[in-house]
Design a protein with these regions (language model features):
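Aromatic-lined carbohydrate-recognition surfaces of secreted/lumenal glycan-active proteins
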Residues: 175-184, 286-289, 309-345, 366, ...
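Amphipathic, heptad-repeat alpha-helical segments
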Residues: 1-22, 57-122
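N-terminal substrate-binding region of glycoside hydrolase catalytic domains
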Residues: 29-32, 174-264, 288, 365, ...
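Conserved, mostly hydrophobic/aromatic
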Residues: 121, 181, 203, 231, ...
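Long amphipathic alpha-helical scaffold segments
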Residues: 127-186, 190, 194
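Active-site cleft segment of glycoside hydrolase catalytic domains centered on the general acid/base Glu
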Residues: 212-225, 252-349, 374-385, 465-477
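Active-site-adjacent "subsite" loops/lids of carbohydrate-active enzymes
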Residues: 240-278, 416-435
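Aromatic-rich peripheral "rim/lid" segments of glycoside hydrolase catalytic domains that contact
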Residues: 279, 293-294, 298-305, 312, ...
Length: 495
C-alpha cells in the first residue's frame, strides 16, 4: 500500500476543514484512485493501493474563492512530507501555464492584467520553495501564490470566454446552443409557465419511470402528455427523459423484487423504454435514455450490469425510433466518487466503453451539481471547469450540460434525495445572490464551447419535487429568485 504525506500549516486548519476527508489521489488520466485520508497532528496521510506518482486533489480554503478543489502536480512518493500549500501552489501555476500555452497556440489574445498576477504568483512560489526549511513560512508564501494564481486564472478564463463568444456571435447572431430547463414531475402553474418561456428555448420532459409507473402496470401519463402538448404549442425544443435513473431510489420501488434477477429486470426496463418512446414517437426526437449509470446505486446492479443494460436500452430505443437522437447522462463528471473504491471505471471510461463498443450514442449529458455532497460535484474555478469540458470533448460526441447550484443551505422539504449543501464551497456563501452570480460566471463559459450543444438547468421551481436542494430558479411561493433574472439576461444577450 502506498502512502503520500503532506505537512499542513497552519495546523488549526484541520479544526474547520471537513472537506479534507473527501480528498483523493488521481493519475495522469485524471481518474480518481481509491484513497483513504488520515490526519495525524499536522500531517495529512493519503493511503492508496499503489505507489505510482499521482496528484492530490483537495478542497482548499482560498480567500475570495471559497473552497475550490486544487490539485498538486504529479508527485512521487517519498519518506519525508511535502508541504501541502507549496505543492498546491505549484500545481495551480502549472495548470494555468499549460492552459495558457494551449490558448496562445489557438490564437487567443492574452489580457494585459493577467501577466502581472501570473508573474507575482511565480515570485511567491519561488520564495516559498526557498524557505521550505520553515514549513510555516513556506506555507504563508505559498498561500499568497495560490491566491494570485487563482486571480490570474480567473482573468485569463474570463478573457477566453469573452473572445470565444465574440467569435461565435460573428458566426451566429443567435447562438445555436439550446438553453433549457426541466419541466419537473408536476404541472407548472400559469405564472411559472411564463417564467419558463422568458428564460428558455428548450424543455426537458422528465418521463421518469418511478413517477410514470409507481405500481406495476399502473401508468400515469397525464402530466407528461400535457407537458409535451405545451412544449410543442410554444415551439420549445423537447428532450424526453431521463427514462431510466440508475442512481439510488431512481427506479420504481416495485422493481426491487427483481433486483437479483438481472434478465427479468432487463426485460422490464426494455418494455418500459419501448412503451414510452412509442407513446411520444414523432413528438419528441431527443431522448435521454438513462441517467447516472456511471456512479449507479440502483438496486443490486454492478458496474458491468449497468454497462450491459445501457447498451440494451440503446438497442431497443433505436429499434423503436430510427430517427431519434439518444443521449446518456453522466453525473459527477470529475469522478470524485471513485475515491470510495466501489468503481473500476471513471466517468469518461464508462462512456468511452460504450462508444468503443459501437453503441449508437448521439451525445453525452454531463450533470454538474456544484456545492452538493455526497453525490454532487465540489466547487471548481472557471479554468478547471473549462478543462473538464475540453477533456470530455475528446470522446468526439456533442455535449449537453445539466446544471444545479444552491440558493440556500438549510433543509429543503421538497428534495427527493439526501444531498446536503456545502454552503462555503464557492466564493460567496450559498444564497440567492450566489446562485445568480454563479450562473452569470459559468453559463457563458459553456456557451463559449462549440462542443456544448445544450445547457439545461436542473429544475425551475423549488415547489416541485427535485433532486438538488434549493436549486430552482423560483421559490416555493412562486416568486422568482435573482437567478431567474440572470437566466433571462443571458437569453436576451445570446438568443
Amino acid at each position: 500500500m502506498g502512502v503520500m504525506r503532506f505537512a499542513v500549516h497552519p495546523t488549526g486548519l484541520f479544526d474547520d476543514w471537513p472537506e479534507v476527508h473527501r480528498a483523493y489521489i488521481s493519475g495522469v488520466d485524471q481518474a480518481a484512485w481509491p484513497t483513504r485520508i488520515e490526519v495525524a497532528g499536522n500531517q495529512l496521510l493519503c493511503r492508496r493501493q499503489n505507489s505510482d506518482s499521482g496528484k492530490l486533489n483537495i478542497a482548499w480554503p482560498v480567500p475570495g474563492f471559497g473552497r475550490p478543489v486544487l490539485a498538486t502536480a504529479s508527485l512521487p512518493e517519498r519518506q519525508h512530507s511535502y508541504i501541502l500549500a507549496v505543492e498546491l501552489a505549484r500545481g495551480k501555476i502549472v495548470q494555468v501555464r499549460n492552459q495558457l500555452a494551449v490558448w496562445q497556440a489557438a490564437g487567443m489574445a492574452i489580457p494585459e492584467d493577467f501577466v502581472p498576477l501570473h508573474r507575482e504568483a511565480h515570485r511567491l512560489l519561488a520564495r516559498s520553495v526557498a524557505v521550505q526549511h520553515d514549513p510555516a513560512e513556506a506555507s504563508e508564501f505559498a498561500q499568497q501564490a495560490i491566491i494570485k494564481e487563482c486571480e490570474a486564472a480567473e482573468v485569463l478564463t474570463r478573457s477566453y470566454v469573452s473572445q470565444r463568444l465574440e467569435v461565435r456571435h460573428r458566426q451566429y447572431p443567435q447562438l445555436p446552443t439550446v438553453f433549457g430547463c426541466s419541466l419537473g414531475d408536476s404541472p407548472l402553474a400559469p405564472e411559472q409557465q411564463q417564467q419558463f418561456l422568458s428564460g428558455f428555448n428548450g424543455a426537458a420532459v422528465p418521463l421518469q419511470w418511478r413517477y410514470i409507473e409507481p405500481e406495476e402496470g399502473d401508468y400515469r401519463w397525464e402530466t407528461y402528455d400535457a407537458q409535451v402538448d405545451w412544449g410543442m404549442e410554444n415551439q420549445l425544443l423537447l428532450r424526453g427523459g431521463p427514462l431510466v435513473d440508475l442512481s439510488p431510489n431512481g427506479l420504481p420501488k416495485w422493481l426491487s423484487q427483481w433486483e437479483h434477477d438481472y434478465w427479468n429486470l432487463q426485460s422490464f426496463v426494455c418494455d418500459f423504454i419501448e412503451t414510452v418512446i412509442s407513446r411520444y414517437l414523432g413528438r419528441i426526437r431527443i431522448w435521454e435514455i438513462a441517467a447516472r449509470p456511471n456512479a449507479g446505486g440502483a438496486l443490486a446492479l454492478t458496474e458491468e450490469n449497468r454497462l450491459t443494460l445501457v447498451a440494451k436500452i440503446l438497442e431497443v430505443a433505436r429499434q423503436v425510433d430510427q430517427e431519434g437522437q439518444f443521449l446518456l447522462r453522466i453525473d459527477q463528471p470529475w469522478g470524485e466518487y471513485q475515491a470510495r473504491g466501489q468503481h473500476k471505471l471513471s466517468p469518461m471510461h464508462f462512456a468511452d466503453a460504450l462508444v468503443r463498443a459501437g453503441m449508437d450514442l448521439s451525445a453525452i449529458n454531463l450533470e454538474i451539481g456544484v456545492g452538493y455532497s455526497p453525490m454532487g460535484s465540489a466547487s471548481r474555478d472557471l479554468i478547471d471547469f473549462s478543462r473538464m469540458i475540453d477533456q470530455w470533448s475528446v470522446l468526439g460526441l456533442p455535449l449537453q450540460v445539466t446544471l444545479a447550484f444552491p440558493s440556500a443551505a438549510e433543509h429543503d422539504p421538497n428534495q427527493t434525495t439526501d444531498l446536503e449543501v456545502d454552503a462555503r464551497s464557492w466564493k460567496i456563501l450559498a444564497s440567492e445572490e450566489a446562485q445568480a452570480r454563479w450562473i452569470e460566471d459559468y453559463v457563458p463559459l459553456l456557451l463559449a464551447k462549440p462542443s456544448v450543444l445544450a445547457v439545461f438547468w436542473n429544475h425551475l421551481s423549488d415547489a416541485q419535487p427535485h433532486r438538488f436542494p434549493h436549486a430552482g430558479l423560483v421559490r416555493p411561493d412562486g416568486q422568482a429568485k435573482a437567478a431567474h433574472a440572470s437566466i433571462v439576461r443571458l437569453r436576451e444577450l445570446h438568443w
